[in-house]
UniProtKB/Swiss-Prot annotation:
Gene: GPD
Site feature (Activates thiol group during catalysis) residues: 178
Protein species of origin: Coccidioides immitis (strain RS) (Valley fever fungus)
Binding site for NAD(+): 12-13, 34, 79, 315
Keyword line: Cytoplasm, Glycolysis, NAD, Oxidoreductase
PANTHER family linked to this entry: GLYCERALDEHYDE 3-PHOSPHATE DEHYDROGENASE, GLYCERALDEHYDE-3-PHOSPHATE DEHYDROGENASE-RELATED
SMART domains reported for this sequence: Gp_dh_N
Gene Ontology cellular component annotations, sorted alphabetically: cytosol
Pfam families per UniProt: Gp_dh_C (PF02800), Gp_dh_N (PF00044)
Active site (record annotation): 151
Disulfides per UniProt: none
E.C. no: 1.2.1.12
Recorded metabolic or biological pathway in which this protein acts: Carbohydrate degradation; glycolysis; pyruvate from D-glyceraldehyde 3-phosphate: step 1/5
This protein's name: Glyceraldehyde-3-phosphate dehydrogenase
Length: 337
């Protein structure tokens, strides 16, 4: 079964989701909406990418859309999501990737245009969040608007799940060492709510807030209130790393932690988590499709209850692949499979 999908917002995640969809046999992008981009520019932005290289297929444009590998993709320029005629393209599922319509009420506007489900590619204040490999099996077909959480939550949640399932996670603090993103500044500029966030991204290590750790409690209820964290924005363009320092209920050695991660990555979290004992650096993970790459040689243990775990993630490519995987999964549930 091929699921027909629309994308609202052809920014960083919208374009990387599109590229991932081309590689996914169960998902076909049939429409894109972005009021700020014309079709010829959309084709250029899809074809060339400074981080992920040239698009491997064929991209052309016409007045009303893109032709990608011989398949036509309708292109709209509506500002109001309610006015996007998703139904005329057959797009049953819509990816909301503008970063603007992240609440259930705002994202529900897509339903007026004929979409059956809306997947928000960002954390949401009120829409149910799903992380593949962690809580996707709790999805029910009556949910119309859902969130794929954040890239950091998608890395941290599988990591925390393995610790909690095997050894009990009492409490933990997370730091994500995160590549800069489009919301940051190329040179110092005004940022009234976050003064540090207004400093030049490529010149500074910038402490920042993140709700990614607390969000784990929403996808793993037993960990609610047990995790919190912060972010350090660093001068790299892509790939980030989670540092989880936590206390376990059961006595455990670091070798036992490694074995649990290795086992999970080969079984229930296969495709979501991977395990590595190589001497990795961030650029080695550019384009990696996993949500969480456990770095077995980077972690340490203070004692048999207090450990530090390190896991990499491509915050663009890996996250975008999960958006597509989530759509394929919920479409299967909706179809009764």
């Amino acid at each position: 079964m091929v699921v027909k999908v629309g994308i609202n917002g052809f920014g960083r995640i919208g374009r990387i989701v599109f590229r991932n969809a081309v590689e996914h046999p169960e998902v076909e992008i049939v429409a894109v909406n972005d009021p700020f981009i014309e079709t010829h520019y959309a084709a250029y932005m899809l074809k060339y990418d400074s981080t992920h290289g040239r698009f491997k297929g064929d991209v052309k444009f016409s007045d009303n859309g893109l032709d990608v590998d011989g398949k036509h993709v309708r292109f709209y320029q509506e500002r109001d999501p309610a006015n996007i005629p998703w139904a005329e393209t057959g797009a049953d599922y819509v990816i909301e990737s503008t970063g603007v319509f992240t609440t259930t009420e705002k994202a529900s506007a897509h339903l007026k245009g004929g979409a059956k489900k809306v997947i928000i590619s960002a954390p949401s204040a009120d829409a149910p969040m799903f992380v593949m490999g962690v809580n996707n099996e709790t999805y029910k077909s009556d949910i119309k608007v859902l969130s794929n959480a954040s890239c950091t939550t998608n890395c941290l949640a599988p990591l925390a799940k393995v610790v909690n399932d095997n050894f009990g996670l009492v409490e933990g603090l997370m730091t994500t060492v995160h590549s800069y993103t489009a919301t940051q500044k190329t040179v110092d500029g005004p940022s009234s709510k976050d003064w540090r966030g207004g400093r030049a991204a490529a010149q500074n290590i910038i402490p920042s807030s993140t709700g990614a750790a607390k969000a784990v409690g929403k996808v793993i209820p037993s960990l609610n209130g047990k995790l919190t964290g912060m972010s350090m924005r660093v001068p790299t363009s892509n790939v980030s790393v989670v540092d989880l320092t936590c206390r376990t209920d059961k006595s455990v050695t670091y070798d036992q932690i490694k074995e649990a991660m290795k086992k999970a990555s080969a079984n229930e979290l296969k495709g979501i988590m991977s395990y590595s004992e190589d001497a990795l650096v961030s650029s080695d993970l550019n384009g990696d499709t996993h949500s969480c790459i456990f770095d077995a040689t980077a972690g340490i243990a203070l004692n048999d209850h207090f450990i530090k775990l390190v896991a990499w993630y491509d915050n663009e490519w890996g996250y975008s692949r999960r958006v597509i995987d989530l759509i394929a999964y919920i479409a299967g549930v909706d179809a009764g499979k």
